[in-house]
């Protein structure tokens, strides 16, 4: 989508890189536009999910009773870490049979999706231009974003899945009647007439709590990855300011390399940390669904 008339080249560059490959061929006009399908987010998220499945399958196939290799040892270390966290948070052993593998999958999946942000900003656009697939507006890959977790739909979709699991385990453990009763009687417990007076307030607080957990879980991941992606674009603009072998261009070029390297190293921590936080909160929220107020 072209930038508004009179916009600077820098603004046009950023606006172009923030538009998804979708079914309408341009940027969404509003945040919630349910007729829009972002093909790039679907492709890269599914591809990273399949890669997680393949890596876990490969580790299971190569598993031996003897001294594990580096790859097997690395996977076993991650599995043990996630399993330990699941045991300490979700006390129901039967629930952990599903929740622990889910947490492991979510953790690795988000790591791989986040790691796509470490690819050079203009790597794929350059490839699309050279192949003629994205040289100008109207080409099939003129718009293409590689980072699924910087698309609000992906983190919010995952957080919605966690919310549904909270409802599922809440109803399963407490039974439908107990779950509904808790919505109206907690966190302010009372008896008699007072319980009837407090029931609407309890329901409202519980609904707000569920909504806040779901929204904050998705927005935290989205916000951090979107900001990281935007910073990489701003750093890339330093390199794009090259005008020849002069003092200003050389200084900007050095700044581009240094800033890009420092931010990439720091961003590795963000990639891992955001995946860990999402996994831990998934376990915490599902664990809380097993407990009463």
Swiss-Prot record:
Organism lineage string: Bacteria, Pseudomonadati, Pseudomonadota, Betaproteobacteria, Burkholderiales
One Gene Ontology molecular-function label: proton-transporting ATP synthase activity, rotational mechanism
UniProt xrefs under Gene3D superfamilies: ATP synthase, F0 complex, subunit A
GO cellular component term of the entry, any: proton-transporting ATP synthase complex
UniProt cross-references to PANTHER family, sorted A to Z: ATP SYNTHASE SUBUNIT A, CHLOROPLASTIC (PTHR42823:SF3)
Chain's gene name: atpB
InterPro entries listed in its UniProt record: ATP_syn_F0_a_bact/chloroplast, ATP_synth_F0_asu, ATP_synth_F0_asu_AS, F0_ATP_A_sf
CDD domains linked: ATP-synt_Fo_a_6
Protein name (database record): ATP synthase subunit a
Quaternary data: F-type ATPases have 2 components, CF(1) - the catalytic core - and CF(0) - the membrane proton channel. CF(1) has five subunits: alpha(3), beta(3), gamma(1), delta(1), epsilon(1). CF(0) has three main subunits: a(1), b(2) and c(9-12). The alpha and beta chains form an alternating ring which encloses part of the gamma chain. CF(1) is attached to CF(0) by a central stalk formed by the gamma and epsilon chains, while a peripheral stalk is formed by the delta and b chains.
Compartment annotation: Cell inner membrane
Function: Key component of the proton channel; it plays a direct role in the translocation of protons across the membrane.
PROSITE patterns associated with the record: ATPASE_A
Any GO BP: proton motive force-driven plasma membrane ATP synthesis
Topology of the protein relative to the lipid bilayer: Multi-pass membrane protein
Organism in which the protein naturally occurs: Bordetella pertussis (strain Tohama I / ATCC BAA-589 / NCTC 13251)
Keywords: ATP synthesis, Cell inner membrane, Cell membrane, CF(0), Hydrogen ion transport, Ion transport, Membrane, Transmembrane, Transmembrane helix, Transport
Keyword set includes Ribonucleoprotein: no
Family of the protein in this entry: Belongs to the ATPase A chain family.
SUPFAM superfamilies: F1F0 ATP synthase subunit A (SSF81336)
Membrane spanning stretches: 40-60, 97-117, 151-171, 188-208, 225-245, 264-284
Predominant location category: membrane
């Amino acid at each position: 989508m072209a930038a508004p008339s009179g916009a600077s080249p820098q603004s046009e560059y950023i606006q172009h890189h923030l538009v998804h490959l979708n079914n309408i061929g341009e940027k969404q006009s509003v945040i919630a536009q349910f007729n829009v399908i972002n093909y790039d987010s679907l492709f890269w998220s599914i591809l990273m999910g399949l890669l997680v499945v393949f890596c876990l399958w490969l580790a299971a196939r190569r598993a031996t009773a003897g001294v594990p290799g580096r790859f097997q040892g690395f996977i076993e270390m991650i599995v043990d870490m996630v399993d330990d966290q699941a045991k300490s948070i979700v006390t129901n052993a039967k629930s952990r049979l599903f929740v622990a593998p889910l947490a492991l999958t979510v953790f690795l999946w988000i790591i791989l999706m986040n790691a796509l942000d470490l690819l050079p900003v203009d790597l794929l656009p350059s490839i699309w231009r050279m192949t003629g697939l994205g040289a100008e507006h109207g080409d099939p890959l003129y718009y293409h974003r590689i980072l699924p977790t910087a698309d609000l739909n992906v983190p919010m979709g995952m957080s919605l899945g966690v919310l549904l699991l909270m409802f599922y385990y809440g109803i399963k453990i407490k039974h439908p009647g107990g779950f509904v009763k808790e919505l109206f009687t907690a966190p302010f417990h009372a008896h008699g007439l007072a319980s009837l007076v407090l029931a609407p307030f309890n329901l409202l607080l519980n609904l707000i709590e569920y909504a806040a957990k779901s929204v904050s879980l998705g927005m935290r991941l989205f916000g951090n990855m979107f900001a990281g992606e935007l910073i990489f674009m701003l750093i890339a603009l330093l390199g794009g300011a090259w005008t020849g072998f002069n003092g200003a261009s050389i200084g900007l070029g050095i700044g581009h390399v240094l800033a890009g390297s420092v931010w990439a190293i720091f961003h590795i921590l963000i990639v891992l940390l955001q995946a860990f936080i999402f996994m831990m909160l998934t376990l915490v929220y599902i664990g809380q669904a097993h407990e009463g107020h």
